[in-house]
């Protein structure tokens, strides 16, 4: 049901409390006994997805997997140069947690700042290789240590890719 009032019982030690849940933010499937919620304020011990993300104002709406950097007219834009030190993350499609969720902008985008994310990628890569920005806007590539620039590394590859064509590669976003 999507238009109902729910009271969910919570038990803590010897106490019992029924809390009202706003149905505009909640769906309940009685067949699977699953509760889904768009926004949750509280404590969670696990998450279905694997990246920590934040909302930023961008120059446009970007596709999931686009590599982004500080700059442009607002706060962020796509990466535009190889080994770009202002790179901050990857556009996320299914973040585990979104910080700054109430932020408003003409083009609010969700940027994965750490964790596992798919990224647009050009060239070959092996699991564990360091990842940076390429010459293609918003597309990552394997780092060539000869061209290293401080701050240019966005993460490490979690998988192998043996083709030169552009595709998606799962990476661990983080500072290395």
Predicted feature residues:
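Short secondary-structure subsegments characteristic of cysteine-rich extracellular domains
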Residues: 27-29
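Beta-strand repeat architectures
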Residues: 31-33
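Extracellular receptor-binding modules and their adjoining Ser/Thr/Gly/Asp/Asn-rich linkers
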Residues: 4-6, 10-25, 39-176
């Amino acid at each position: 049901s999507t238009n109902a009032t729910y009271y969910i019982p919570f038990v803590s030690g010897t106490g019992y409390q029924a809390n009202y849940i706003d149905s505009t933010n909640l769906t309940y499937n009685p067949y699977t006994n699953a509760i889904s919620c768009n926004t949750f304020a509280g404590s969670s011990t696990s998450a279905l997805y694997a990246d920590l993300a934040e909302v930023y104002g961008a120059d446009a709406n970007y596709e999931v997997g686009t590599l982004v950097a500080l700059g442009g007219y607002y706060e962020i834009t796509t990466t535009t140069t190889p080994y770009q030190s202002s790179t901050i993350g990857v556009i996320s499609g299914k973040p585990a947690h979104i910080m700054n969720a109430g932020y408003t902008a003409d083009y609010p985008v969700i940027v994965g700042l750490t964790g596992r994310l798919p990224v647009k990628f050009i060239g070959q890569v092996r699991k564990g290789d360091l990842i940076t920005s390429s010459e293609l806007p918003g597309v990552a590539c394997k780092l060539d240590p000869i061209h290293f620039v401080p701050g240019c590394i966005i993460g490490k590859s979690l998988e192998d890719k043996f083709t030169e064509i552009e595709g998606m590669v799962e990476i661990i976003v983080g500072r290395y």
